[in-house]
Curated annotation (Swiss-Prot):
Monoubiquitination of Lys-119 gives a specific tag for epigenetic transcriptional repression. InterPro entries: Histone-fold, Histone_H2A, Histone_H2A/H2B/H3, Histone_H2A_C, Histone_H2A_CS. This is Late histone H2A.2.2. Keywords: Acetylation, Chromosome, DNA-binding, Isopeptide bond, Methylation, Nucleosome core, Nucleus, Phosphoprotein, Ubl conjugation. Its main location: nucleus.
């Protein structure tokens, strides 16, 4: 009678930490990078989840704006130029990625006011 528990518990299917957190970005991989990167001696359980969520949010934000830029240019595929336009036209993203060069991104069209023809 003793020591046999309440019956056999069937082992449930493995569920990734990403799906538990409702994320698309890989929490396990982020955790591995945090451990291997020598950022700290120990890494808490919540840190990779939080970082993966932040990375996913930033990626979604940039892709949303780049998709809008592609649609404005009547294109169905996002190219580096659309990423550049999206980042540089958004004040906060431009500040965050100020020192970043996007390959094949080009520059923002900008003509100084003094160079424009004078209106009569």
């Amino acid at each position: 009678m003793s020591g046999r528990g309440k019956g056999a518990k069937s082992k449930s299917k493995a569920k990734s930490r990403s799906s538990r957190a409702g994320l698309q970005f890989p929490v396990g991989r982020v955790h591995r990078f945090l451990r291997k990167g020598n950022y700290a001696n120990r890494v808490g359980a919540g840190a990779p989840v939080y970082l993966a969520a932040v990375l996913e949010y930033l990626t979604a934000e940039i892709l949303e704006l780049a998709g809008n830029a592609a649609r404005d240019n009547k294109k169905s595929r996002i190219i580096p130029r659309h990423l550049q336009l999206a980042v540089r036209n958004d004040e906060e993203l431009n500040k965050l990625l100020g020192g970043v060069t996007i390959a094949q991104g080009g520059v923002l069209p900008n003509i100084q006011a003094v160079l424009l023809p004078k209106k009569k």
